[in-house]
């Protein structure tokens, strides 16, 4: 209770007691005195509570009817043909411009369009990105004075423009003059989207051809051709030979009772073939895998045929003649006047592994499929028939995977890793 309410209540009580005392006469009881309501009190039938206020509350403002938001999802599903291509995507952008002349809600629509670009297959189209930037109102978000340039003028709009440029960067799309002209019209030269554009124009030409082993942008959908390219991409020896041991049969040729026939593609170099011929038949070799290899947004799996590292006493050191040695002389001892602080030796952790004799990619990762690969290798490597082969296989969901928005492969559960390690130990002991 506030002090105003307490003052009014005390004043009313004083007046009430005064009226009762004046009305009381000798010989009359208090019950006969007529009840007089004080002027300061306003009694009601409802019980008084401390939450009720004596001051009247202001009238509630009238609520305007809320307008329903435009369902932007429906704009991308109204294509007459029903196909998700570039034409239907641009048609959805055009419908948004016709529906909202004042460009109201353009930021939400641009964010939605950026998420839908992969579904329509236009994530690498520069004209579509320029069309999205053209949705922004022109000459509205440009800073007019120094204060607006110091602080981020219209930050939400600038973040949306940067999001468009970042998606262009992630897909390797180089902006052009039209992109620069649109950003100048929308945000001005002294803005963060324009700074992002200048960085893209600076670093993209420098990093475009930095990969010494480039991967084509459009990869083949044929699993045999994709496996051949993946094996060639991993094998450093140009004289290595790719062999197709088994071709997958079409679905029409195989019946319901016949098992599917996966493809098997292998690669082996002459040096690997010679090393396998020199291998001791008493020591087993291992088929390990599958191991993942990412080719842009596609993931393929491969297996290797390898052996354990020989102990130091069984290793043979090959001496290279001087006329064949490209690094001759091998040792050159020159004494320079160096102090004790000059240390040119670095600590490098090098792990020596056993030799790898061959690699393959198969449509299935079971032991029966890989046994066919070993049988095919025995035709060119007769000594392989005398060497015991141990299969160390892990679990894999499949060969061909296309990455989604995250471009990352989920890690396997921990319990599967423990089971796989136990199986490897048991197979190694056997």
Curated annotation (Swiss-Prot):
Q: Where is this cross-link: Glycyl lysine isopeptide (Lys-Gly) (interchain with G-Cter in ubiquitin)?
A: 372
**Protein origin, superkingdom:** Eukaryota
Matches recorded under Pfam families: ECSIT_C, ECSIT_N
Q: What does this protein do?
A: Adapter protein that plays a role in different signaling pathways including TLRs and IL-1 pathways or innate antiviral induction signaling. Plays a role in the activation of NF-kappa-B by forming a signal complex with TRAF6 and TAK1/MAP3K7 to activate TAK1/MAP3K7 leading to activation of IKKs. Once ubiquitinated, interacts with the dissociated RELA and NFKB1 proteins and translocates to the nucleus where it induces NF-kappa-B-dependent gene expression.
Q: Name one GO biological process term.
A: cell surface receptor protein serine/threonine kinase signaling pathway
Q: State the family it belongs to.
A: Belongs to the ECSIT family.
Question: PTM comment for this protein?
Answer: Ubiquitinated on Lys-372; leading to translocation in the nucleus together with RELA and NFKB1 and expression of NF-kappa-B-dependent genes.
Its ancestry begins with: Eukaryota, Metazoa, Chordata, Craniata, Vertebrata
Self-association and partners: Interacts with MAP3K1, SMAD4 and TRAF6. Interacts with SMAD1 only after BMP4-treatment. Part of the mitochondrial complex I assembly/MCIA complex that comprises at least the core subunits TMEM126B, NDUFAF1, ECSIT and ACAD9 and complement subunits such as COA1 and TMEM186. Interacts with NDUFAF1. Interacts with ACAD9. Interacts with TRIM59. Interacts with TMEM70 and TMEM242. Interacts (when ubiquitinated) with NF-kappa-B subunits RELA and NFKB1. Interacts with RIGI, IFIT1 and MAVS; these interactions promote RLR-mediated type I IFN induction.
What PANTHER family does the record point to? ECSIT EVOLUTIONARILY CONSERVED SIGNALING INTERMEDIATE IN TOLL PATHWAYS (PTHR13113), EVOLUTIONARILY CONSERVED SIGNALING INTERMEDIATE IN TOLL PATHWAY, MITOCHONDRIAL (PTHR13113:SF1)
Q: Where is the transit peptide?
A: 1-48
Compositional bias segments (type: Polar residues): 47-56
Q: Where is this region: Disordered?
A: 41-66, 400-430
Q: What is this protein called?
A: Evolutionarily conserved signaling intermediate in Toll pathway, mitochondrial
Q: Which InterPro entries match?
A: ECIST_C, ECSIT, ECSIT_N
Keyword list, A-Z: Cytoplasm, Immunity, Innate immunity, Isopeptide bond, Mitochondrion, Nucleus, Transit peptide, Ubl conjugation
Query: Which residue windows does the record flag with biased composition (Acidic residues)?
Result: 411-420
């Amino acid at each position: 209770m506030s002090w105003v309410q307490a003052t009014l209540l005390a004043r009313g009580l004083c007046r009430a007691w005064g009226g009762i005392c004046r009305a009381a006469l000798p010989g009359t009881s208090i019950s006969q005195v007529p009840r007089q309501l004080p002027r300061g009190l306003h009694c009601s039938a409802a019980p008084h509570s401390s939450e009720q206020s004596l001051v009247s509350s202001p009238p509630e403002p009238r609520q305007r009817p809320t307008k329903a938001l435009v369902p932007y999802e429906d704009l991308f599903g109204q294509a007459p043909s029903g196909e998700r291509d570039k034409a239907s995507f641009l048609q959805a952008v055009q419908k948004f411009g016709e529906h909202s002349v004042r460009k109201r809600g353009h930021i939400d629509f641009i964010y939605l369009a950026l998420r839908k670009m992969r579904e329509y297959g236009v994530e690498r189209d520069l004209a579509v990105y320029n069309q999205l930037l053209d949705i922004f109102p022109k000459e509205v978000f440009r800073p007019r004075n120094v204060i607006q340039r110091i602080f981020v003028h219209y930050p939400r709009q600038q973040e949306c423009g940067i999001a468009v440029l970042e998606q262009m960067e992630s897909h390797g799309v180089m902006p052009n003059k039209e992109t620069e002209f649109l950003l100048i019209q929308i945000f001005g030269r002294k803005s963060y989207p324009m700074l992002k554009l200048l960085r893209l124009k600076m670093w993209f030409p420098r990093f475009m051809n930095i990969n010494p082993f480039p991967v084509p942008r459009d990869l083949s959908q044929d699993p045999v051709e994709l496996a051949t390219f993946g094996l060639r991409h991993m094998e450093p020896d140009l004289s290595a030979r790719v062999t197709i041991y088994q071709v997958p049969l079409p679905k029409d040729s195989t019946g319901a009772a016949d098992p599917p026939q996966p493809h098997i593609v292998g690669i082996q170099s002459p040096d690997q073939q010679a090393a396998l011929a020199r291998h001791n038949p008493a020591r087993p070799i291992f088929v390990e895998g599958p191991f993942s290899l990412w080719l842009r947004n596609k993931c393929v799996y491969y297996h290797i045929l390898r052996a354990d590292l020989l102990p130091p006493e069984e290793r043979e050191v090959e001496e290279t003649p001087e006329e064949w040695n490209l690094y001759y002389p091998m040792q050159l001892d020159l004494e320079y006047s160096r102090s004790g602080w000059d240390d040119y030796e670095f600590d490098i952790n090098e792990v020596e592994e056993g030799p790898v004799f061959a690699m393959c990619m198969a449509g299935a990762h079971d032991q029966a499929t890989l046994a066919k690969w070993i049988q095919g290798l025995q035709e060119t490597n007769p000594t392989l028939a005398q060497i015991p082969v141990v299969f160390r296989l892990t679990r894999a969901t499949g060969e061909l995977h296309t990455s989604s928005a995250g471009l990352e492969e989920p890690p396997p559960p921990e319990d599967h890793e423990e089971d796989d390690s136990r199986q490897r130990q048991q197979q190694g002991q056997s």
